Amino acid sequence: MSAGEIDRLIGLLARLPGLGPRSARRAALHLLKRRESLMDPLMEALGAVAASVRLCPVCGTLDTRAPCSICADPRRDGTLICVVRDVADLWALERGGVFSGRYHVLGGLLSAIDGVGPEDLGLDRLAARVAEGPVVEVILALPATVEGQTTAHVIADLIEPKGITVSGLAQGVPVGGELDYLDDGTLTAALRARRPV
């Protein structure tokens, strides 16, 4: 492997969240030292994921099925839709095991600074799902940040005129907090004590 190929690997690893240039360099060296036990299985797993995992056309989560296993599960409560920023937030709620409804993954939050508008988040898809029924409540499980609150208000303005209850997570989610970093107990309490937006 030439230095250029190693540099390319380091550069790609550095693009992953939480990995800077130094961490990416260490990860690359670790992979290279453990080719058979780590790098080859990792390449195999990445290839399999790239070939089989896709976004659910209904809710936007990642799955090997379309629609995903959550959307296809008849035991899930179709009257509740929990709106989350991204798949990591959905996984955090599923880990808690307290929500039995369906989800809608936005894929981000509204942000004038970053140029992210309602059309970028597929809010029209959410409105269409609500209009199709049998939804009676939309739970906004969004971060307690400026962008999260802005997104929540836009969604509430879109959904409430349809006569649907719109609620948000209650206490337990700190201002500026990220759902993926909360412990299961805090997340469970916040979901159970949700409130109208």
From Swiss-Prot:
GO terms for biological process: DNA recombination; DNA repair. It comes from the Bacteria. Keywords: DNA damage, DNA recombination, DNA repair, Metal-binding, Zinc, Zinc-finger. PROSITE patterns: RECR, TOPRIM. SUPFAM superfamilies: Recombination protein RecR (SSF111304). GO terms for molecular function: DNA binding; zinc ion binding. InterPro entries: DNA_Rcmb_RecR, Rcmb_RecR, Rcmb_RecR_Znf, TOPRIM_dom, TOPRIM_RecR. Residues 79-174 form the Toprim domain. It holds the Pfam family RecR_ZnF. A zinc finger (C4-type) spans 56-71. Belongs to the RecR family. HAMAP family: RecR. May play a role in DNA repair. It seems to be involved in an RecBC-independent recombinational process of DNA repair. It may act with RecF and RecO. This is Recombination protein RecR. The lineage of its organism: Bacteria, Pseudomonadati, Pseudomonadota, Alphaproteobacteria, Rhodospirillales. The gene is recR.
